[in-house]
Amino acid sequence: MKLIEHYVALVKTGCAEYGQMNEMTLTEIADCLFCTERNAKLILHKLENSNWIIRESGAGRGRKSKIAFLRRPEELLLQTAKEYTMSGKLKKAKELLQQYQSAFPGLQNEYNMWLSEVFGFVTETGENGAKDVLRLFITPESVSSLDPCQIFLRSEGHFVKQIFDTLFTFDSDMQEPKPHLVHGWEEVGKKQWRFFLRKGVLFHNGQPLTSRDVAFTFQRFLELADNPYKWLLHGVKQVLEKGPYCVELILDKPNALLPYALCDERLSILPAEQGGGKNGTGPFQMNQQHSGMLVLEANERYFKGRPYLDRVEFVFSEQAGEMNGFTIQEKQTCPEQQTVFDERHVQYLSLNLKKKGPLQHRSFRKALRLLISSERLVREAGGHRRIPVTSFLHPSPFEWEGVSPSELLKKSGYEGETIVLYTFSETDHREDAEWIQNICAQHGIRLTLQFCDAADLRRPEIVQMADIIHDSATFYQDSEFGFLHLLLSENSFLYQHLSEKLTQICSGMTERMFSMPDRCSRINILRDIDRQMIQELNAIPLYQNVLQVTSSKNVKGLVLDEEGWIDLYSVWLSK
């Protein structure tokens, strides 16, 4: 039993009135706490040290001690639940409140009211005046790495964007790069690019951004042995500083996509002085990161203008997925409004054609495609699942000729071998995987599920153990680069699962793309790759999500970034 539980038990047994002396023998106390008299003395000592009781020991064996109970149990239970919550122990807080729900019926409501006041969008007043704070729960693995070229999860990309900046950003309306840390650039021939940096941009530690930092960042990016994104600097062989505010890239082959690549957060600019680190030029700077919390503070000197938020606190909790991270309220009670965002994240299955087994037979893969109906999955699983898809890029659905799955399974020679599907442990992944498992079982396919954390799914040996991996791909703003990441990033599940034939096709066709200045021509090549991949059944696209954001009407500037997270830079609270 925990100290709070000991206290509640003693109050129930021996408290006639709070603050007044109540008589109990040590034997009665030990019986109440289900422990020895020796342990009862230790517990009483701890309660005294916590200032929860005052005790006067009785003289002689069997004499009654006098105990004054100073705190009401419901106050302490609520305080303990709050402490658990702020340290990310949501499950413990929930279990504690449920344990005493019948004894203290109003406790859960008080906790819920407190939770709505301190989480979400709140205004807090302290020594330095009023501060607008956004406080959310996230899982600890959401920020396993804040090194831009080690990003694996969308959440990591989101945090990197808050702390760092890139030379360009992608204009989703114009579908082209626009200057960010640069104010201009020029292409000299087809193998030489010059970029001209803005003056007056400062890192969070006050040091100015110069060409040295850009050169350091790109050189580090090219030289890191375990960087899975080297294709982003395709053809770059030399990075030169041409004065304090000019950087020149020398290529050994044309790369028409270079300005687009320089929008990617994996090429965020790091300070040369510190050899990297978490000191960026972005709109927020890291105040602290430890096992319980990540805190971002507004960058007062941000070159694009200070964020409206003063501070953002992310409380780590393994149960964060059970909380609605997109419910943003303010402390004052306001009518709610609901904003729905379509999300260009495509949920899909990557089929491992490098592994021996039933998936090597195209008839078996085709049977799976027919059984795992995107329309049926969206209809039956519901929730955030919105638009069934049959490809990554093609607007029109792929049609399959009318062969029954049972005939295809028979043709493939399938004899009940076990197929293993790996995916993340979050609820939406579990729901999809269990739905797929049930469909397969109905048709005699033995499918087992392995739910993993991100750290395991980063490991190439785990990826190759899987027959199938369930994941989602980001296509929110730039569908061209979203698909290229699937095809070329070495930590992409699809990249690691592609058949030898498709690997060669992708390599040849994407190599041609880099020399094409016309975006429409490049998209057509990607659609051709998409078509061949779907026909070869190396991947099974499933559906697009819809994200729902609920907020009070006083929360303004709600925009989701391409990772599906709230754009922290633009959101604000109207008083």
Curated annotation (Swiss-Prot):
Name the InterPro entries on file.
SBP_5 (IPR039424), SBP_5_dom (IPR000914), SgrR_HTH_N (IPR025370)
- Give start and end of each HTH marR-type domain: 1-120
Q: Which UniProt keywords apply?
A: DNA-binding
| Keyword DNA-binding among record annotations | yes
Q: Which GO terms describe its molecular function?
A: DNA binding; peptide transmembrane transporter activity
Query: Which ranges does the entry annotate as DNA-binding region?
Result: 26-49
What protein is this chain from? Uncharacterized protein YhjP
Name its species: Bacillus subtilis (strain 168)
